[in-house]
């Protein structure tokens, strides 16, 4: 396949073969919102940036006065359209990402956004669930990445080299396909 002279590579990582592996939490699972919010507040006090992937966890934080550094949302919770957001941000980005996949370009986009000192909101046309992977790989050591575990609670990843190694291991098992 020729990709030279083409600004956009239309390739994705596909995770159909990894559904079972990806269904378990890859961090600390919080099932109690009070304890979860206390942990996040202490993390902010220690200087950690908070990054959320998912509408529900983003909304829980916002409703409790915590505005994440970066939110990655698709406007849906459990595939159901959610209400409009109450908080607006200075920087808003739009990306496209199909369900069960991660577009190659998302990795560079997330890296650039996370280098920015302002953060913001990434609106995903499609599905954001798997974008925890590029976010975790691009986040700073000590950043907190939060995503929802359906019917269980919120999963908190404290970014370090060990978790990056685990994420790269998952990524190596994914299948590269045309989007």
From Swiss-Prot:
Pathway as given in its UniProt record: Cofactor biosynthesis; coenzyme A biosynthesis
Keywords from the named record: Coenzyme A biosynthesis, GTP-binding, Kinase, Nucleotide-binding, Transferase
Recorded family membership: Belongs to the GTP-dependent DPCK family.
EC number: 2.7.1.237
Function of the protein: Catalyzes the GTP-dependent phosphorylation of the 3'-hydroxyl group of dephosphocoenzyme A to form coenzyme A (CoA).
Enzyme class: transferase
Binding-site residues, GTP: 55, 57, 74, 76, 128
Protein name from the UniProt record: GTP-dependent dephospho-CoA kinase
